Every structure is written in structure tokens, then in C-alpha cells.
């Protein structure tokens, strides 16, 4: 039998995308990256709504905050990948009869397609009284508040950094109001220098605060995630 020296059969071939008339080169590069991204392929194969699902999966593998019976709030939940992960991890559908049944509440400004096992509400979490409505929907306080939110990109790196830090701080203040003692806060940030104040804020309220870049986060992205555990109340 002839030896395979081309490398084919040893790994998946990369998909090359031609630049179509009217399509920008940047769009072509993005499409090519998507088509060759193993996390995109896994998301499609496993039924997740986006590759971001693997970020929360990897964070939970390390910190174990999505446990059966937990009550979870997902801020800015569209398109729903994080909710899908949470539903499975907290046993929201009661599929594991020997485990406690959790609850998953998704919050977003836009309408989100229904997710089995999750309760989705169209709400601006910055609205007055949003914290009370969330606790009412949950039937009590949350064990986990998580956010993969990002402000609309301005194209200016530092401006985008400041916007997402402000959004993360707003999410943190909501978490202070709705979290059960001992709870966990997880949120996306972009590196850029202003994380210090956010870290100080979270360290006042949580016993441990970590900055993590999970493997599913692209290496060329400045995103990372803050994981704050042990809410002091």
C-alpha cells in the first residue's frame, strides 16, 4: 500500500473561500475562519446555537458552578448557547431523576427563540425594578448570574474596552441584588487596562475572583472572562 505523504486523511482539509464580487476581503476572511473553526463545527454537530457555548462549558469544567438544582440567570442570553449549556448542567428538564432540578432564566433586549428547559424574558436588565422581576420569575434568589454580553463595536479598541467594562459593572451590580450568598458571577470582559476597578469591586463582594481565557476563546481576541465565586451577600 502506498504511503500517504500528503497529510490528507490525517487531518481535516481547510476550506478556502474565494472573495466574491461585492464581498469585502475582511468578510471573506471571517467566513473562511468560521468554516475552519473546530468549535463552530462542534456547535453544529452538538446542537448548540453558537461556538460561545463551549466557553461556558470550559469555565464550568474548571469552576463547577452549574450544578444540578442551581438557579441561573443568563444576561444578554441571545442567541441562547449559554442557556442551552446551563439547562443540561443544572438538570432544568429533570432528565436525571437522581439529581435536583434547577432553573434557567434568560434575559435579553431582543426576542430569543424558545429553549427547552429555559424561561426567556425580553427585558432591559438596567430598567428600574429589573432585579425584583428576576427574583419573582426565579421564585427566589439566583445561584449563578452569567453574562456573555458585549456592547456594539465602535471600531475603536479602547472605546470598546470601556463600554464592555461598564456593561460588566452594571451586570455585577444586578448580581449583587439577585445572588444568593455563596453564589457565582461570570462575565465577559475585553482586556485594555480598565479591569482594575472592576476587580476591586468584585473582590469586595466575593471570596475569590479570577480572570480566565478558556480554550474556546480565540487566541487573537482580547476577550477573557471574570469568574467571581463565594458571594458574601
From Swiss-Prot:
Specifically methylates the uridine in position 2552 of 23S rRNA at the 2'-O position of the ribose in the fully assembled 50S ribosomal subunit. InterPro entries: RNA_methyltr_RlmE, RNA_MeTrfase_FtsJ_dom, rRNA-MeTfrase_E, SAM-dependent_MTases_sf. It comes from Ruegeria pomeroyi (strain ATCC 700808 / DSM 15171 / DSS-3). Its EC number is 2.1.1.166. It is found in: Cytoplasm. SUPFAM superfamilies: S-adenosyl-L-methionine-dependent methyltransferases. HAMAP family: RNA_methyltr_E. The keyword tRNA-binding does not apply. Pfam families: FtsJ (PF01728). The active site is at 188 (proton acceptor). It catalyses: uridine(2552) in 23S rRNA + S-adenosyl-L-methionine = 2'-O-methyluridine(2552) in 23S rRNA + S-adenosyl-L-homocysteine + H(+). It is an enzyme of class 2 (transferase). Belongs to the class I-like SAM-binding methyltransferase superfamily. RNA methyltransferase RlmE family. This is Ribosomal RNA large subunit methyltransferase E. Keywords: Cytoplasm, Methyltransferase, rRNA processing, S-adenosyl-L-methionine, Transferase.
Amino acid at each position: 500500500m502506498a504511503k500517504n505523504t500528503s497529510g490528507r486523511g490525517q487531518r481535516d482539509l481547510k476550506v478556502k473561500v474565494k472573495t466574491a464580487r461585492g464581498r469585502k476581503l475582511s468578510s471573506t476572511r471571517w467566513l473562511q475562519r468560521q468554516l475552519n473553526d473546530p468549535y463552530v463545527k462542534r456547535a453544529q454537530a452538538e446542537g448548540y446555537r453558537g461556538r460561545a457555548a463551549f466557553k461556558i462549558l470550559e469555565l464550568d469544567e474548571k469552576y463547577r458552578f452549574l450544578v444540578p438544582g442551581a438557579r441561573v440567570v443568563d444576561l444578554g442570553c441571545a442567541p441562547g448557547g449559554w442557556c442551552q449549556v446551563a439547562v443540561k448542567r443544572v438538570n432544568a428538564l429533570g432528565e436525571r431523576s437522581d439529581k435536583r432540578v434547577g432553573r434557567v432564566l434568560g434575559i435579553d433586549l431582543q426576542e430569543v427563540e424558545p429553549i427547552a428547559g429555559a424561561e426567556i424574558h425580553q427585558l432591559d436588565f438596567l430598567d428600574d425594578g429589573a432585579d425584583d422581576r428576576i427574583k419573582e420569575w426565579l421564585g427566589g434568589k439566583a445561584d449563578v448570574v452569567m453574562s456573555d454580553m458585549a456592547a456594539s463595536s465602535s471600531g475603536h479598541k479602547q472605546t470598546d474596552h470601556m463600554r464592555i467594562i461598564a456593561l460588566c459593572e452594571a451586570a455585577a451590580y444586578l448580581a449583587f441584588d439577585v445572588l444568593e450568598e455563596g453564589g457565582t458571577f461570570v462575565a465577559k470582559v475585553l482586556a485594555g487596562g480598565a479591569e482594575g476597578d472592576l476587580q476591586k469591586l468584585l473582590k469586595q463582594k466575593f471570596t475569590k475572583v479570577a480572570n480566565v481565557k478558556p480554550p474556546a476563546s480565540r487566541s487573537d481576541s482580547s476577550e477573557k472572562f471574570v469568574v467571581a465565586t463565594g458571594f458574601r451577600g
